Amino acid sequence: MERNHRYATLVIDARTKLPLYLHRGNAAKDFEPFFTIYSKEFYKAIKAFAMDQNTSYSGVVGRRLPQCTIVCDYFHIMKNYSEQVTDAVRRRTGRLFMRLGRKDDAFRIRNAARLLNKRFPVRITDESDWSARLMLDVMMKKNHDLDVCIHMRERLQDLYDSCRDAAAMAKGWGLWCRMAKESGVPELVRFAEKKRLRQQEIVNHALFPISSGTIEGCMNRIKVLKRVSFGLRDYDYFFLRIWQAFLPEGTYRTLSDKVWDDHMCTACAKEDAA
């Protein structure tokens, strides 16, 4: 549509994977209309919301749906860990090696971003995975901070995968945070301190193992539509194309007048989308 970033708020049903709400902007006021377009029974049936760490969104949900459980998205937690811990330690280690004159080690670790964030299967059968794992083991033995970061990431992933009880999740998360603070790795300590503030939302993943991964997958389809629509200045028509893109094959969906009145849509948006 335009250059630079323009954000929108998207709500998707985790079961049907169909969009429920789409609005231009990512502020709290852009999320508020979602709670006025469906019936009271619909909102009472909502048990949990999975979202990123946008405090404005969580504040709106807490105020509008006090009975709803907010789940801090696993995808964004691990993404933050990769960016704020693993990549930060990798860059710091690369700069240290350059100052020490170890240029080969510096270049090797600078080019290992994908390798350091890769999650290997429990049983490795692929030869390329074997060689990559051996290379990772060598780098971990040469650098203590990287070794700690990789092991702590694996413990965090195992915690998300294995815990389906809130008490066990809370205990495991508290233990993980203590280990992170005692590690002595500055990036890991800062990460643990920040995420400790969202402990309850992280623990809620044990009660409702959902994430915004569905939305992240939908974003790939929306990005394709955005490239096709580059130069088009009608956001209402662009949003209509997004609604249409997620229709199941062989079905029809009537767009609610009330939904599109919120977007100030033109008459074309009030027709049936096929």
Which residues make up each language-model segment?
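Short alpha-helix plus adjacent loop in nuclease-associated cores
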Residues: 77-98
